[in-house]
C-alpha cells in the first residue's frame, strides 16, 4: 500500500509527504522522550498518564492515534486522551477482549467523534459487571503495579508537594502481602472465599485453590519503594508488616509510599 501510494505522487507531492513524515517523527520523538525522562508522575499530566497506561498494559496499537491527536488536535488532546484512557481501563478491568484493537484504532483515526465511537465499540463488544471480580484475582505483577500506581497518583492529586518521594513506576516494587510461598508461615491463617465464607482446612484442595487465587488478587498487593528481604517477604503477617528490628530488616510499613 505504501509503494502504491508513493508511486502515484508527483515530485512536489513527495516532498510534501516527506515533510509530513518528518513532522510526525519530531512529535513522536518529543512525546516519547518526555515520557521516558519523566521522574515524577502527577495525575494532572494527562499525556504522560495515558502513555504510562499504554506502556504498562503493553498496548502499542493506539500509538498512531495518540500521535495524530498530538500533531493535529493538541487543543483537544486532554479530552481525547481521557476518552481513550477510560476506554482502555474499562476494557482491562472488566477483562474485555483486545483482539480487535487494530480495527478499533483504524476506525478511531477516521471518525469525527471519538467519544461516540468508543461508546459504540463498548456496546458492540460488551463486558459484564461481574467480570472485574475474576480479573482482579488473576493480575500479573505488571498489571497490579499499574493499578496501585494509578491509585497512588490519584490519592496525591493536588497535594503532591506534601509528599517526600517522587512517583516513577520503575522505582517501585510489588509485594505480595501473603507470599507466593505461603505454605510455610500462613497455613494456620484462616482462608475465606470471595463471598466471605470460611474455607475449611479439611478440604485441602479447595483451601489450596482459594489461597493460590488470593495470592494474585489486587487486595494482596502492596506498592513498596524497596524490595523486601526474602526472610521478611516469606514470613508471617506481623513480620511482613513490621520487619525484624533486631536484624534491621524493614517490612511493608518501612517501605510503603510516604
Language model segments and positions:
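Short, mixed-charge aromatic SLiMs
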Residues: 83-98, 172-173, 248-258
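Betabetaalpha-Me/HNH-type nuclease active-site subdomain
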Residues: 109-256
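A cross-family structural signal marking well-folded subdomains
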Residues: 1-154
Amino acid at each position: 500500500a505504501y509503494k502504491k501510494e508513493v508511486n502515484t505522487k508527483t515530485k512536489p507531492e513527495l516532498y510534501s509527504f516527506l515533510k509530513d513524515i518528518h513532522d510526525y517523527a519530531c512529535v513522536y520523538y518529543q512525546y516519547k522522550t518526555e515520557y521516558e525522562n519523566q521522574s515524577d508522575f502527577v495525575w494532572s499530566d494527562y499525556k504522560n498518564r495515558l502513555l504510562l497506561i499504554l506502556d504498562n498494559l503493553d498496548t502499542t496499537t493506539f500509538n498512531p492515534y495518540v500521535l495524530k491527536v498530538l500533531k493535529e488536535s493538541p487543543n483537544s488532546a486532554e479530552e481525547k486522551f481521557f476518552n481513550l484512557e477510560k476506554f482502555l481501563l474499562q476494557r482491562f478491568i472488566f477483562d474485555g477482549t483486545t483482539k480487535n484493537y487494530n480495527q478499533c484504532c483504524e476506525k478511531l483515526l477516521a471518525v469525527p467523534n471519538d467519544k461516540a465511537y468508543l461508546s459504540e465499540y463498548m456496546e458492540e463488544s460488551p463486558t459484564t459487571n461481574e467480570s472485574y471480580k475474576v480479573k482482579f484475582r488473576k493480575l500479573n505483577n505488571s498489571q497490579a503495579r499499574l493499578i496501585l500506581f494509578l491509585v497512588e497518583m490519584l490519592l496525591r492529586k493536588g497535594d503532591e508537594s506534601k509528599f517526600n518521594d517522587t512517583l516513577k513506576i520503575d522505582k517501585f516494587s510489588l509485594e505480595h502481602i501473603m507470599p507466593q510461598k505461603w505454605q510455610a508461615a500462613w497455613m494456620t491463617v484462616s482462608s475465606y472465599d470471595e463471598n466471605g465464607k470460611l474455607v475449611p482446612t479439611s478440604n485441602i484442595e479447595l483451601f489450596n485453590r482459594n489461597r493460590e487465587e488470593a495470592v494474585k488478587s489486587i487486595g494482596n498487593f502492596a506498592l513498596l519503594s524497596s524490595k523486601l528481604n526474602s526472610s521478611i517477604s516469606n514470613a508471617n503477617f506481623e513480620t511482613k508488616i513490621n520487619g525484624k528490628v533486631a536484624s534491621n530488616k524493614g517490612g511493608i510499613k518501612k517501605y510503603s509510599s510516604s
